[in-house]
A protein has these predicted regions:
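Non-catalytic C-terminal accessory modules of carbohydrate-active enzymes
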Residues: 15-111
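Alpha-helical support elements that line or immediately flank enzyme active sites
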Residues: 1-14
Length: 111
């Protein structure tokens, strides 16, 4: 989700960038240790069609290490401080419609 946010920001779609970071989906959650909760349906199980997506009640976890908190920090830092070629717009990765107030201090632009 942070990769989608950074891509959307660079494409001049800051609302989509924020929406990607805040997307409510089971795989865009963070555990206390910073990992992303990669949950899957148990073998043979089906998602509850009434819910529209698998619920977090399923406990089958994928055995992988995904430190998503680092990606989240990189994405928000880039969205706030900018990147080479961003036109020197303040907080270019956030909508400039009054819905966000962004203050940045000491974070350099990404290439």
């Amino acid at each position: 989700f942070p990769s989608m946010a950074m891509t959307a920001a660079r494409l001049g779609r800051p609302k989509d960038a924020v929406d990607a970071l805040l997307m409510e989906t089971p795989k865009n959650t963070y555990l206390p240790n910073g990992h992303n909760a990669q949950l899957s349906l148990p073998s043979g199980a089906e998602a509850d069609s009434a819910a529209g997506s698998p619920s977090l009640i399923f406990t089958t976890r994928l055995p992988i290490y995904l430190p998503g908190n680092g990606a989240l920090l990189l994405a928000t830092g880039m969205m706030a401080s900018g990147w080479d070629g961003d036109g020197n717009v303040p907080a270019p990765g956030f909508p400039n419609d009054g819905s966000w107030t962004v203050a940045v201090e000491g974070i350099g632009k990404l290439p």
